[in-house]
From Swiss-Prot:
Annotated protein name in UniProt: Beta-galactosidase 12
Gene: BGAL12
Known tissue expression: Ubiquitous, with higher expression levels in roots and siliques.
Keywords from the UniProt entry: Apoplast, Glycoprotein, Glycosidase, Hydrolase, Secreted, Signal
Gene Ontology molecular functions: beta-galactosidase activity
Lineage per the UniProt record: Eukaryota, Viridiplantae, Streptophyta, Embryophyta, Tracheophyta
InterPro entries in the record: BetaGal_gal-bd (IPR048913), Galactose-bd-like_sf (IPR008979), GHD (IPR041392), Gly_Hdrlase_35_cat (IPR031330), Glyco_hydro_35_CS (IPR019801), Glycoside_Hdrlase_35 (IPR001944), Glycoside_hydrolase_SF (IPR017853)
Amino acid sequence: MGLNFREKAWILLGILCCSSLICSVKAIVTYDRKAVIINGQRRILLSGSIHYPRSTPEMWPDLIQKAKDGGLDVIQTYVFWNGHEPSPGQYYFEDRYDLVKFIKVVQQAGLYVHLRIGPYVCAEWNFGGFPVWLKYVPGMVFRTDNEPFKAAMQKFTEKIVRMMKEEKLFETQGGPIILSQIENEYGPIEWEIGAPGKAYTKWVAEMAQGLSTGVPWIMCKQDDAPNSIINTCNGFYCENFKPNSDNKPKMWTENWTGWFTEFGGAVPYRPAEDIALSVARFIQNGGSFINYYMYHGGTNFDRTAGEFIATSYDYDAPLDEYGLPREPKYSHLKRLHKVIKLCEPALVSADPTVTSLGDKQEAHVFKSKSSCAAFLSNYNTSSAARVLFGGSTYDLPPWSVSILPDCKTEYYNTAKVQVRTSSIHMKMVPTNTPFSWGSYNEEIPSANDNGTFSQDGLVEQISITRDKTDYFWYLTDITISPDEKFLTGEDPLLTIGSAGHALHVFVNGQLAGTAYGSLEKPKLTFSQKIKLHAGVNKLALLSTAAGLPNVGVHYETWNTGVLGPVTLNGVNSGTWDMTKWKWSYKIGTKGEALSVHTLAGSSTVEWKEGSLVAKKQPLTWYKSTFDSPTGNEPLALDMNTMGKGQMWINGQNIGRHWPAYTARGKCERCSYAGTFTEKKCLSNCGEASQRWYHVPRSWLKPTNNLVIVLEEWGGEPNGISLVKRTAK
């Protein structure tokens, strides 16, 4: 009995899948106008971003296997310079930063790698991936025709390429790396800075080509990429993108599966129907490489998040922050990938013929001697359409594409979701793990304390801390004469200007108030009347960084901390300008200096317990221990009763918490139909931008796990709980 088309198609798909497993064999990687070519075969490549430092090494095999099961061919990752070179010439490639291990795990799964060396990454990552020490190299100007910058970035790029070659990880060596990226979204920066930017683009392309990796280089959002470099598209939609040369394939390096969450912002999400539509439209217009940014977003552990970026980098990705499939997105895209692979022979062999089927409907047909594939599109956002194609009628929902791998049978429609979300809704379930908290109150320093230094005027925060801590103290004394009239009248007004990001003001050891900025407006002004007495008053300003900016120009000019003006209004003489007074400075908190987040450090201070535990007090450390819950479900801390600070598990920093920063925005009913933007579909409005904070299971011991919380604002520790993420 003969095989029908569907049976033949699935056999072909199986052959293609098997061929993708052969990653240990040396292969030649080239390209033409249609596609990337691996060993002489044009390929439609489906890729997903998974950033190795945003998950633990123990999570990597499962994440990559799920990506493979979801129909991906390629794993894409940035290389994170500041994680790998924390000090000049001192390199780190261990634990979450073990890049070689990550790539080998991908290879073992039978997938390819797209390595985005950059080394600028953006990625909502602290300082865009640049090491902070780079800012203080003499003569440094970032990302332009500047010799100190070019020397540093070339040295690091060469270091990474050399490592990859030594481990034989490029495809031409039998490894999985089929593509590399130099720079990142540089086109808009080049346009802004002009001629030096153009010179830098030319230089960086020539430098990359000179490294002889044997695989193609790409530059994303770089319309003037040289002929030897493939320019690619980033965005929510890229069907109208065209490379700058007829001999380059149409590639999409970032199809945004959702959007990042910022502290103070609502949580964005992107409907599965829309992202599937974006992929189908790109393919039907001749696209041959698609990468989902992100396929798994993960977590901004430690202090790796960019300015005001939440600790969760979930991104509404097909695999959620904890590595679990997000439905229906994961399965809906998995089905799409299978159907695209059925169309692959036609897609790589022919250009589409486009035919109108109605006012907002059209057919894109790929036909070769041995294959035919059709994409039927309905761009109407509100009305379904019945279209006639090839002598048959097809019903197309609004804002959708139907795919016919044999030009006859509809195998898939982007708006027809076959997975019921209600049956697999994920939620946080209490583990009933008991906590018994102890507290340690941080001391408020004074201007003459040990460990301080003094100078006239205000200093920029990061130039002193070098981003080794979020915290920096500005200290001075305010001497008030007994004849000041405000002592028997209205309190004076203290006004403080800061470049960001948050500020706690203490007067005579007591919290007088707090101010903080936002991602949109990181600069802040504290303006509040304060209580002063005759004699010497102690003013202590704790400036808090909430990540460093990750996008923009002239990184060397960016500032953080209290830069003024600082004024006191309401004194007898009118206003005192305190900006140029003598100030004392102190780096970090006492608890950090004592390493109270570690087991050894926590034993060096006295913890109050029982009824003496401080509650709703600023600058308080909390300590408890707990046993690991049974099972293997992912775990998180519910921090909804706390304000702002950081958390550690067994000495490892799980990130910044800031549940007291509630989400702005209007969360309204969101339709999949119509052009998507990052502000279209929102959740969590009026609630914490982030309530739950991932606790990796691999960081836990069976018993007696140490949890430490630094609370800046004041919170209720008894409300903290350990929860597990599981299906409803």
